[in-house]
Amino acid sequence: MIVYFSGTGNSRFAAEFLSKQLNDELLDTGRHMKAGEKDTLHSDRPWVFVAPIYAWRMANVLADYIRSAELTGSKDAYFVLTCGGEIGNAGQYAAQLCKEIGLNYKGVLEVVMPENYITMFNAPGEEESRAIVAKAKPVLEQGGELIRKGKDLPAHKVGLLDKLKSGPINEGFYKFYVKADAFLATDA
């Protein structure tokens, strides 16, 4: 089962792409999160969790959802993380999550998509966005093939800066910048 959270559509695109490639069931957690539901999910096939990177880690809302859900059936878990540039050391945190809830971590796939965190970064234009998505498709295809075969995704090379970004810098971003609060636009 492909379980995803998407804030702006990049992760939804990746999840739908993989769902078609793998002929696997798709679950949009957004509706479930809004309803405050604690889900019981079953999959005989590997779990594929798809989410955006928020400050070099998987979005906390999906990690929290995964922790709260009762997952039965398969014990294998893959993570497909969409980002504007890179995922830092997000794989380590996904592996820790798997250990916490009793799943077998099968790796993380970094999928570069158009930047959309416009409060801090510039979004690319339409032509550049199309080129970025075109480059993401073969990455998704290759990752999907490994998932289909039950193989681990290739290890993501992690350096000291990646550890800092996904560790203390992530915590600072969440404290000061990453907000999911509702916002309002006025004519003022």
Task: Map each language-model feature to its residues.
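FMN-binding flavodoxin-like domain, especially the glycine-rich phosphate-binding loop
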Residues: 1-2, 6-14, 20-33, 37-51, ...
